[in-house]
A protein has these predicted regions:
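A generic structural signal for residues embedded in beta-strands
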Residues: 32, 94-95, 148
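C-terminal hydrophobic helical "lid"/dimerization subdomain
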Residues: 1, 229, 280-340
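A glycine-/small-residue-rich N-terminal strand-loop-strand element
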Residues: 72-96
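A structural motif shared across PLP-dependent enzymes of the aminotransferase-like
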Residues: 41, 95-107
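Short N-terminal strand-loop motif that marks the start
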Residues: 1-64, 68, 335-340
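Mid-domain Rossmann-like dinucleotide-binding core that forms the NAD(H)/NADP(H) cofactor-binding site
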Residues: 118-197, 201
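Glycine-rich phosphate-binding loop and adjacent beta-alpha segment
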Residues: 223-293, 297, 336-340
Length: 340
């Protein structure tokens, strides 16, 4: 039996590897065949380009190979003798496991995709748990103004979650006109270009004069955080959801944070609880469950976020397009359905 997987062999060199695979299972393991697999462009391109701060536990610069990918949907092919939660034919989320065609996973590492949620939607579940965390940590109150800065996959999901949480108005900003239009279609009340000369004044005007009470910062750039500090309301909260990997500018902490009572909240997914959820801090699996409920009910829409589906056989070309194109696709799925 063979398994195929995506590998970053070196900086800016992505390849598809095929090698032997042993499908035999331990009693608590599940054999899963991948169906669809979402590329997390921010994280994966940071690793592809060998940027700093790609690992919260240390500096990985210059260290290859790397195994990208962590948001997969698949179906159960067989189960070990002690498995009780899954059976052959079940559709499942496979988190933190790379872009690959086959998996052997302990049953407590998987999550069931219910009927009414497609495999393409299910492939978004793990990545969607990141903006769930970023929005939950803000603990948005009904009627609070919210800004989502940066409209990649995470930001466009965060726009919908901020709206569902009772934020009003919900503002969104991004350089891309196409993404601003999509944010409006998905529920944003206003969408702005942060390069506009009167951007700060517009944001404040649209939120009653003071600025938004809560900001989901997903640009990944320190300049985006600086801008948020200039338009946020006094006593406001900023959730750092995007990974700001390069600290390339000073911030006047006294003027923009200390003196105005601003809360800066780290919202990296590694900061969530492992076992029990509590207000503002939910486990991954509880966020997966909420994602499934909202998608199934039609109140969270991730279908418009996927605008390209490709074969893993196109791995080198896909990462070159994502890494170097001036207008890269928003959401890219690997389609593993024709791999044996």
């Amino acid at each position: 039996m063979k398994v195929s997987y995506v590998l970053f062999e070196a900086k800016e060199k992505a390849v598809l590897i095929t090698e032997d695979f042993d499908p035999s299972l331990q009693p608590n393991e599940v054999l899963v065949k991948a169906d669809y697999d979402l590329i997390s462009a921010g994280t994966e391109l940071a690793n592809y380009h060998d940027l700093p701060n790609t690992n919260v536990f240390g500096d990985d610069r210059g260290i290859y190979p790397r195994w990208p990918g962590y948001s997969v949907s698949g179906h159960v092919v067989s189960v070990g003798s002690a498995v009780t939660k899954f059976k052959a034919g079940d559709n499942v989320v496979v988190p933190w496991s790379g872009h690959r065609s086959w998996f052997k996973k302990e049953e407590d590492k998987l999550f069931l995709i219910p009927e009414g949620v497609s495999q393409q939607e299910g492939a978004v579940a793990h990545l969607a748990s990141f903006p769930f965390l970023g929005v939950r940590k803000l603990q948005i109150q009904l009627g609070e103004g919210v800004m989502v800065a940066g409209l990649g996959l995470l930001g466009l999901i965060a726009v919908q979650l901020a709206k569902l949480s009772g934020g009003y108005p919900v503002l969104a900003c991004d350089f891309s006109e196409e993404r601003r239009k999509l944010a409006l279609e998905l529920g944003a009340d206003h969408a702005l270009d942060p390069r506009e000369p009167d951007f700060i004044e517009k944001v404040k005007s649209l939120t009653g004069g003071n600025g938004p009470n809560a900001v989901v910062e997903v640009t990944g750039y320190l300049s985006g955080l600086q801008q948020a500090l200039e338009y946020i309301a006094p006593m406001g909260r900023i959730s750092i959801l995007g990974c700001t990997r390069i600290s390339d500018a000073p911030i006047n902490v006294y003027r923009y944070i200390h003196g105005r009572g601003i809360q800066i909240i780290g919202a990296h997914t590694m900061t969530r609880p492992k076992q029990e959820s509590h207000p503002g801090y939910w486990t991954e699996k509880d966020d997966y469950a909420t994602f499934m409920k909202l998608v199934k009910a039609g109140v969270l829409n991730v279908k418009p976020l996927i605008n390209k589906i490709v074969s893993p056989r196109q791995t080198p070309e896909v990462y070159k397009e994502l890494g170097f194109s001036k207008q890269p696709p928003l959401g890219v799925l690997f389609d593993w359905t024709d791999f044996e």
